[in-house]
């Protein structure tokens, strides 16, 4: 029906949350719609974190032949201008922001979600355990990118099984991202529990994690 109206532009406003690979799906859908209505399509998308959702922005314009005419950056607010020539058969290509690579895209989505969640809930900092492993290193880097290293509080909680290498890596990480750093050995607490409970196997391993959780919550 819109194709019969001879419209100049189809405008669609969206609050479409981020999913990996979704930008290509949106573009494919917009290309089909622009061809159906025989008019360029402007796809506007919300940007920012809201609770457990992240909106990635990346608004764009496509022509009737599927040409990408304009694209805003992902994961940031942006003001851009696109000139629509209603007398032209096809539009001129404007500014097209580069797409991040897949790993950078997911990382940036996590950082934006954390940053906006903290801001909207008036949280002042991030407190987390630093084991010296890749898991906590990645989360700490995200936190530093979201709120600044000076607002990140890293806690090393070594046990009798922790290697010197792991301890050194945790300290190096905190220094590299500019985070606060403290050491809280869990061996005395672990020994106290074991003297009473005499746990073995998985139960003993889980005890270390529970002790570390209590320490992080206490700091938080």
Annotated model-derived regions:
Residues 1-129, 145, 149, 181:
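Enzyme catalytic cores with a strong preference for nitrogen-chemistry domains
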Residues 3-6, 147, 177, 197-220:
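Active-site adenylate/phosphate-handling loop in enzymes that bind or generate adenylated species
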Residues 11, 124-130, 134-171:
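ATP-dependent adenylation/pyrophosphate-handling site
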Residues 21, 25, 50, 101, ...:
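Alpha-helix capping and helix-loop boundary segments enriched in small/acidic/polar residues
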Residues 21-24, 53-56, 137-142, 156, ...:
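Short acidic, glycine/serine/threonine-rich loops at helix termini
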Residues 30, 170, 216:
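Aromatic/hydrophobic pocket-lining residues that form π-stacking "cages" and hydrophobic walls in ligand
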Residues 76-83, 151-156, 160-201, 209:
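A conserved beta-strand->alpha-helix junction
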Residues 106, 139, 212-215:
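Catalytic-loop motifs flanking and including active-site residues across diverse enzymes
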């Amino acid at each position: 029906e819109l194709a019969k109206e001879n419209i100049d532009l189809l405008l669609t406003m969206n609050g479409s949350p981020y999913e990996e690979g979704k930008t290509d799906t949106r573009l494919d859908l917009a290309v089909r719609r622009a061809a159906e209505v025989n008019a360029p399509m402007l796809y506007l998308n919300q940007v920012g974190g809201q609770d457990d959702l992240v909106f990635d922005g990346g608004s764009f314009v496509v022509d009737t032949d599927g040409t990408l005419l304009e694209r805003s950056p992902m994961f940031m607010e942006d003001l851009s201008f696109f000139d629509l020539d209603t007398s032209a058969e096809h539009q001129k290509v404007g500014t097209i922001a580069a797409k991040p690579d897949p790993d950078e895209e997911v990382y940036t989505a996590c950082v934006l979600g954390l940053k906006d969640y903290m801001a909207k809930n008036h949280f002042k900092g991030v407190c987390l355990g630093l084991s010296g492993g890749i898991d906590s290193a990645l989360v700490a880097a995200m936190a530093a990118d979201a709120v600044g290293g000076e607002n990140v509080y890293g806690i090393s909680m070594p046990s009798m099984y922790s290697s010197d290498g792991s301890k050194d890596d945790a300290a190096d990480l905190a220094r590299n991202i500019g985070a606060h750093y403290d050491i809280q050995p869990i061996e005395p607490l672990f020994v106290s529990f074991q003297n009473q409970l005499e746990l073995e196997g998985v139960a003993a391993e889980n005890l270390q994690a529970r002790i570390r959780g209590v320490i992080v919550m206490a700091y938080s």
